[in-house]
Amino acid sequence: MDFYGTIGPACADVKLLQQMVEAGMTGIRMNLSHGPLAAHKDWLALLRKAGVKKLLIDLQGPELRIGRLPQQLSLTAGQTVRLGAQGIPCPAALVHSVQPGQELLLDDGKLLARVDTAEPDALVCTVVRGGVLQSRKSLATPGADIQMPTLTAEDKENLAIAADCGVTGVMLPFVRGAADIRSLRQALAEAGAPGLKILAKIENLAGVQALPEFLPLVDEVVIARGDLGNAMPLWELPRCQKQLSAACRAAGVPFMVVTQMLDSMHTRAVPTRAEVSDIYNAVLDGASSLMLTGETAAGQYPVQAMEYLVRTARTAM
């Protein structure tokens, strides 16, 4: 079984990474939504020194994110905010596709805004659930059909150097169907890296519904519960996870479970009972891989989080 961490400021240290490997970590995810692969040469060098063997890059793909902010924003309930021109930067496709009355979920649903007015180049919204918003955080609009390309220009640049950087697998966000996988396969071939593993992230209802058509085309499925939980009432997410797990098992396709596995360990040295139970059950469901994201990238206890992930999973094996 594979255990992945996510590299970030909290673990960007050779000794910490080595301790995570000693705890059982078998690979690292690098999130390229926050910067291109070429800009992370220092992290790549750290991973080599620490003896990390597997490196997954998480592309931008058709994912919606806000742009760069001069500084983080503190948003409060009832506040009016603009997304688009003269406001929080966001994709033009979002502005052109969303209607008044629809909701916007930001940062995996931590913040919620309602669209009041749709202008030609901006959305005027009211904050329903406030919080701190940082650059490049995710955006989701339940029920909206927003057409985004499978790969961005930056994604293709990252793929062109992936093999030389030691990348072993590519994670494609928000897979909507077989066409997305074929586009990535073609891009990998053009980049001279046809042997890299493809991991399809299921993060919306389109991906859930299209799973049977692209299952034969991928090396692994990623049940990415953050944005997937924004696509449905949250109480339906556990059932969806179980159904996706069963479909992958039946097809003989490996699958990974990710997002908030040990979320409390951002700030606590010991996880909750619910979190370790979640890990244990994911293994019983047949998961071939588990991954930590913010727990290792930005949390206070990256090594301890990896220890709990590995030890709990191995107890279930």
Spans of features found by a protein language model:
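Non-catalytic helical/linker scaffolds that mediate oligomerization, partner binding
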Residues: 1-317
